[in-house]
Amino acid sequence: MTRRNFTLFSLASLALAGTSGFMLGKVEPKVHLRPPGAVENFESLCIKCGQCVQVCPYHSIELLGFDDGVNLGTAYINASKRGCYLCDLFPCVLACPSGALSHNTSEIKDVYMGVAVVKNLEQCLAFKTQSVETSHIQHLLARKSYNEREQEVKDILSANLGKTCALCVNSCPVNGALVFERKEQRQIVLVKDECVGCGVCEEVCFARVIEVVPHAKHRQKFKTKEKNE
């Protein structure tokens, strides 16, 4: 999206949000993955300026469209397309003028976006001891790299070719958030308490085994499992 088109979209979003409230209000809001530092009342504080979109070096942040009702024009992350790589200094946070992204967010430990959940372990290539093939990640490698950071993402993906799949663990920007545990000659990916819900694992998992649940906490999703262990 060009800067001109981006500006026009932002203005249109503001206009529609103000004049079509009666129509948008009938749409049930969805729960979306928000950028790092998003406060509890993010939807009411986000002014739809798009500054976070403009400064994100990974092009992870987008603005919600017309189908999203009252959330139209607010910033979100579609982890299945591009997760958040938790940049140094969090440029999206620094660019936010309204406080929708808390400026107290300066380190990864300050981030809480959600939590990753393994949905279908039987389809996991690591669990099946299958190797990564070019066809598996071609859609990711085909993305244009606009800077060194995006190229580094591709380099990590390429380094996994021909090896037993470990894309989620190797790509995760948070040390220790995803780990493998070996049980009965199989690799099982575990989501640990360090997970902040950045969504990178969902992006790189071509088997669609992992997804991020926005706003959820590790203890909520894994409490039952931990009790049984």
Regions found by a protein language model. Give the residues of each.
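Non-ligating segments of multi-cofactor redox enzymes
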Residues: 1-229
